[in-house]
Amino acid sequence: MGFYTDVWDDVFFAVVYVREGGVLERQLELLRQAGWKIIEIPCKKIQNSSGSEEASVIVFEAIEFPYEIPRLPDDWIHEYLEDLHWLDLSQGFFFVLKNYDALFQSPHDPHYYMAKWAAQLLQTVDTELRYRYSKDENGEYDPANILYGMEVSQEHLDQVLEYFEGRAIVIPDFDENDPGAEHPLYVKNNDEVLESWKYESK
């Protein structure tokens, strides 16, 4: 079973970093130096959780939620993830799923339910959070410095790419002079897909 089971999933493109390449760690290092807020979700802990409710608590803790965690955390995690008003995101924000491929290794989750659950967190960051922070004080559109990605081992890279049905973008490098810029491969892929949708709608 692949990721794209819902019509709304079509607008999501997974951004993948190969752990052994060291690209992600170097990029995160430079972004931290530039004042970016980095949130890393430990997918091995997600894998070892009892399910999405306990996993949601892990995410609430990772995003430094300052209030009492809701009684039904799985019902609320996306709503708070698209907000994050208690964090300083003024310089930029990077949301990372660490060791994402761990979610494909559980014998108790043959349909990769938790892999999709975790990837949907990235969807919320990409769409809802990015939109919320993409309006300036005059209400004009001003794209926010918001990035997301998942870290995957070389060993399980093909498995993850197959799960995302060829729509994932593997990041080979980044501009060290502008580490917060979206990678040209990601931008090109988005532009091509959006253009194809316009063509199909004619």
Go through each PLM region and give its residues.
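Positively charged, polar, low-complexity stretches
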Residues: 2-202
